[in-house]
Design a protein with these regions (language model features):
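Substrate/cofactor-recognition hotspot
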Residues: 76-79
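Short, exposed beta-strand-loop hairpins at the edges of beta-sheets
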Residues: 151-156
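Charge-rich, low-complexity N-terminal segments
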Residues: 86-88
Length: 168
């Protein structure tokens, strides 16, 4: 249980999910595999919490979903993060007032890094990410999307706990 944690993920409407998944699936079709968690919705992480907070977080998400509305966002750039052994290729939603207001609901998280909303496409060695980045950049054009759902997950192993739709 020491390595387990709960994560709040901000997810997208079906159209945005389809666009982002399509980009990632093209990478898979080209032979890239990566180390990122699979079979979870496209998202950006709002924060991590201790597993003992599960009931509290479930209640909190239900309340937040009633008070925060789904909101539009623009995806206008591809980016990279450097990790100790790997790099992360991502597509980032543009930060907005609505996104920051939602993030404020999770200011008590235990994350060790500064928050930078991003949707991971691939995690792998730097040379692999460099090649994958070129592939994504050849086809990427900015697009509009919508943040519409909050998910609560436990990792590792992956366990979906709850998903709540933001108000319309």
């Amino acid at each position: 249980m020491a390595n387990k944690a709960l994560y709040i993920l901000a997810g997208y409407d079906d159209r945005t999910e389809e666009i982002l998944s399509g980009i990632q699936n093209k990478l898979y079709d080209e032979g890239f595999s990566g180390l990122q968690t699979r079979n979870i919705p496209m998202h950006f992480t709002m924060g991590s919490y201790a597993v003992e907070q599960e009931e509290e977080l479930k209640n909190r998400l239900e309340k937040i979903a009633e008070t925060h509305r789904a909101f539009d966002t623009e995806f206008n750039h591809v980016g990279l993060f450097r990790l100790p052994e790997n790099d992360v290729l991502f597509i980032a939603p543009e930060v907005s007032r609505e996104m920051l207001a939602l993030k404020d609901e999770f200011s008590d998280n235990r994350d060790q890094f500064n928050w930078s909303p991003h949707t991971t496409m691939l995690i792998d060695k730097p040379a692999v990410i460099q090649e994958a980045t070129q592939s994504v950049l050849k086809k990427f054009t900015s697009f509009s999307g919508k943040v519409a759902v909050l998910h609560l997950y436990e990792f590792w192993p992956t366990r979906h706990i709850l998903s709540v739709q933001l108000a319309d």
